[in-house]
């Protein structure tokens, strides 16, 4: 736990990024990716019900597997041969498999490498986090991005103070211990931009990046993605939609409420 202040430490490597930033150094200009998330940390997505959270998770997961694809715009994955672990806590096996297959369908290659998928609906809430930790331990040294959709199913009640605190502390511990980036999902309180319960409050306080989804005010078929909080540079706001094949895609890296962007049409040749 001791930190040597004289030690030269590198910035945590990036797992997912959107865009680049340039800084001035003694050696000149340095460009670096603006992180959505870095290894050794966790982020979370918050959104109202039925705002396509799982579609957005699929979009991020597919970009991570491929490094970048036609669906993700300027979002980039920095996988470096690591595994993607995808846990669905809510859906039954059929619906969960459909989500996992969507991620593969969006990949630029047929061989996606190490992509491990789990449906935890039948597992009790007390055992879900233990199971996730077990999977990370079994895959030690290979873990990259870990998706937990959604975090509320890891506790009995999002307003249980003790359980919520322990859950977030465990997520912090796992991300650091296994040098992975954990992305999880939680609902927003009705009519507000706050994540639900004590669990949401603890996530806000401890997260590296807080990602907010909102139904787009310009186009009802779009969802706007913004960086509500970040420990580093905030990524630019953008929107995504769902194409005719049921696959999510970025419709514009920068969201301008005064301008109308017609969603680009994806054809079978695009896929």
Spell out what each predicted region is.
Residues 44-46, 50-55, 162-253:
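Phosphate-binding/switch region of NTP-binding enzymes
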Residues 69, 78-162, 166, 245, ...:
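Conserved inter-motif catalytic segment of the P-loop NTP-binding fold
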Residues 1-103:
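The Walker A/P-loop phosphate-binding site
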Residues 6-10, 108, 233-236:
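Proline-centered turn/helix-capping motifs that create local helix->coil transitions or kinks
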Residues 265-271:
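Short acidic, hydrophobic short linear motifs in intrinsically disordered regions
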Residues 63, 67, 103-106, 154-157, ...:
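Conserved, well-folded catalytic cores of nucleic-acid-processing
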Residues 37, 76-80, 107-109, 137-140, ...:
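Conserved catalytic network of the ASCE P-loop NTPase/AAA+ motor domain
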């Amino acid at each position: 736990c001791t930190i040597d202040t004289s030690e030269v430490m590198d910035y945590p490597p990036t797992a997912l990024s959107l865009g680049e930033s340039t800084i001035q150094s003694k050696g000149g200009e340095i460009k670096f990716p603006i992180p959505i998330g870095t290894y050794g940390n966790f982020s979370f997505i918050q959104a109202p019900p039925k705002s396509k959270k799982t579609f957005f998770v699929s979009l991020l997961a597919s970009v991570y597997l491929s490094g970048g694809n036609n669906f993700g715009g300027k979002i980039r994955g920095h996988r470096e041969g690591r595994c993607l672990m995808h846990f669905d806590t809510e859906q039954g096996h059929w619906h969960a498999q459909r989500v996992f297959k969507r991620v593969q369908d969006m990949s630029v290659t047929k061989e996606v490498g190490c992509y491990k998928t789990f449906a935890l609906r039948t597992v009790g809430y007390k055992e879900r986090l233990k199971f996730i930790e077990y999977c990370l331990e079994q895959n030690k040294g290979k873990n990259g991005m870990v998706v937990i959709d959604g975090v509320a199913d890891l506790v009995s009640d999002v307003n249980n103070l003790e359980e919520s605190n322990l859950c977030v502390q465990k997520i912090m511990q796992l991300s650091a211990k296994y040098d992975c980036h954990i992305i999880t999902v939680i609902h927003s309180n009705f009519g507000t931009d706050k994540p639900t319960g004590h669990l949401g409050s603890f996530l806000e306080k401890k997260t590296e990046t807080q990602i907010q989804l909102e139904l787009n005010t310009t186009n009802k078929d779009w969802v706007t993605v913004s960086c509500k909080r970040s420990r580093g540079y905030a990524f630019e706001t953008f929107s995504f939609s769902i194409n005719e094949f049921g696959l999510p895609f970025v419709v514009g890296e920068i969201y301008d409420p005064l301008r109308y962007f017609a969603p680009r049409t994806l054809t079978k040749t695009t896929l």
